[in-house]
Amino acid sequence: MTTFSEKEKIQLLADIVELQTENNNEIDVCNYLKDLFDKYDIKSEILKVNEHRANIVAEIGNGSPILALSGHMDVVDAGNQDNWTYPPFQLTEKAGKLYGRGTTDMKGGLMALVITLIELKEQNQLPQGTIRLLATAGEEKEQEGAKLLADKGYLDDVDGLIIAEPTGSGIYYAHKGSMSCKVTATGKAVHSSVPFIGDNAIDTLLEFYNQFKEKYSELKKHDTKHELDVAPMFKSLIGKEISEEDANYASGLTAVCSIINGGKQFNSVPDEASLEFNVRPVPEYDNDFIESFFQNIINDVDSNKLSLDIPSNHRPVTSDKNSKLITTIKDVASSYVEQDEIFVSALVGATDASSFLGDNKDNVDLAIFGPGNPLMAHQIDEYCLTVNIQISTSTFSLIK
């Protein structure tokens, strides 16, 4: 017998979808969850990142082993709300779909974890050991919340970690890292009619970029053996086999120049220009390697005119894809999903696990598994299937 009806579960999700946490204000969700946990006599604690951003930690059970369940409370910007069919911050149920910002990424997964915690406690189905819920702030950008919890030791004693990001029929045991690398070139501004007495920062930046492309292309020729295999993920998401060449490329290091800035007006030689890259490190080419890779090119071009800044730096995470945690989730999920639809894979994206696990990653079984299609994340008219919330809640309740 469940504590909440299906209608009540949807209302709980609706309540936190209405709390607008676009890259901020997670404290509102923390306060809501604190009241909910208090109602069911579950011990919880709010840990502030700053005035408007906070995490909440809740626990049931005691002793070992310790299983951590995690989800983030922030969502990405909804963009122009006029482009949405339904209001992004009002849950709309239509034809078996739950529309709203965060339904997939990832308030749906978070609320499934919260409901699981409450129902296990209320039904006296407490596990042997401890279940610790970690709801985090700031995952979408700098993972401030996860870093705070890791620094305070909330992951030091855990044996397993489930992050309820949207995964469809997938269960993920590992993922790439993510780095933001900004290269800035400086020059000397002068009137564009006399460029020879100035120093065009764009020229220096282009020299860097041309060398980067050449050396990155050469690196990728040798990037052929990978610890992380993302092919099962792509096969499921695109619905067909991918070539060995594409699977090999996707499983390796990737780097994309995604932002370029330079110059302020057409008749002035620019004294500053910048490129920003998103790099996805892998175990073979980790974050330290990437930093050196960029810095070496800067040194080759002109280190007096070029500088490197790394505002975001999340490491790849690996664990045993045949762990007891992964096997248990797969076995339980097969009661609700066709066995041949379930797959185990590495993930191309990054999660709070990068900040959570750190040096402790070799001692923790990791599973990324939650309701929603990952392709719906960050989209206009984001939705999660109602049945996916139900399946995830049922699955989580049996992993204990």
Swiss-Prot record:
Keywords: Amino-acid biosynthesis, Cobalt, Diaminopimelate biosynthesis, Hydrolase, Lysine biosynthesis, Metal-binding, Zinc
Record-listed Zn(2+) 2 binding positions: 105, 140, 378
Gene3D superfamilies attached to this UniProt entry: 3.30.70.360, Zn peptidases
Required co-factors: Zn(2+); Co(2+)
BP-aspect Gene Ontology terms: diaminopimelate biosynthetic process; lysine biosynthetic process via diaminopimelate
Residues noted as binding Zn(2+) 1 in the record, renumbered to the chain: 72, 105, 165
EC main group: hydrolase
Enzyme nomenclature, EC number: 3.5.1.18
Cofactor binding note: Binds 2 Zn(2+) or Co(2+) ions per subunit.
Presence of the UniProt keyword Protease in the record: no
Catalytic residues (UniProt): 74, 139
CDD domains xref list: M20_ArgE_DapE-like (cd08659)
Catalysed reactions listed for this entry: N-succinyl-(2S,6S)-2,6-diaminopimelate + H2O = (2S,6S)-2,6-diaminopimelate + succinate
GO MF annotations, alphabetized: metal ion binding; succinyl-diaminopimelate desuccinylase activity
This protein's name: Probable succinyl-diaminopimelate desuccinylase
Gene: dapE
